[in-house]
């Protein structure tokens, strides 16, 4: 590989890392979100709430294992000021509903239109787990499958006071 090509690759990697880093700590503007169960989440529904947001797809085996942990987190944190929301990248509501039923998942799910994802990360990997604090600031954007212990620790990370 030519020196110029190596330099271009290095600069591209650095710029991508910087772009990702600049999103962490930024305020999230919540869009109106239509859940597959018919519920509408208006931006005001997020005030004072921390959030764990997971982007996933039905065809992803890593997402299947990850979502089992997300379901456990959702059930364990219902009484806390923490909202768990998942956004399926599939684009087919019926497919996602069948998938949710067949796996026994009860966590809230919407189809991803890309708006919220672009506000949280420049990365396109799934699963992608994002943590937003109660002040609506993005605290973490975690690519890939996580262990059960790490997923369960997200509640503490989301609810921790800023600073």
List the predicted regions and their residue ranges.
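A short acidic/small-residue loop/turn micro-motif
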Residues: 16, 48, 145-147
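N-terminal export signals
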Residues: 4-21
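Short loop/turn microsegments at loop-to-beta-strand junctions
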Residues: 28-29, 51, 126-127
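N-terminal "domain-start" segment that seeds a small globular fold
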Residues: 18-43
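Short active-site neighborhood of thiol/selenol oxidoreductases, capturing the structured segment around
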Residues: 45-61
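Structural microenvironment flanking redox-active thiols in thiol-disulfide oxidoreductases
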Residues: 64-103, 114-118
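Thiol/disulfide oxidoreductase modules built on the thioredoxin-like
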Residues: 101-105, 113-154
């Amino acid at each position: 590989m030519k020196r110029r090509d190596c330099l271009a690759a290095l600069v591209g990697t650095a710029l991508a890392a910087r772009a990702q880093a600049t999103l962490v700590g930024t305020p999230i503007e919540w869009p109106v979100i239509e859940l597959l169960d018919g519920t509408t989440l208006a931006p005001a529904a997020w005030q004072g709430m921390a959030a764990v947001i997971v982007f996933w797809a039905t065809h992803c085996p890593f997402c299947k294992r990850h979502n089992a942990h997300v379901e456990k987190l959702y059930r364990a944190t219902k009484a806390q000021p923490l909202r768990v929301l998942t956004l399926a990248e599939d684009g087919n509501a019926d497919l996602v509903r069948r998938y949710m039923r067949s796996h026994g998942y009860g966590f809230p799910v919407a189809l991803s239109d890309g708006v919220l994802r672009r506000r949280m990360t420049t990365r396109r990997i799934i699963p992608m787990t994002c943590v937003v604090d109660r002040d609506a600031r993005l605290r973490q954007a975690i690519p890939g499958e996580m262990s059960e212990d790490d997923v369960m620790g997200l509640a503490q990370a989301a609810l921790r006071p800023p600073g």
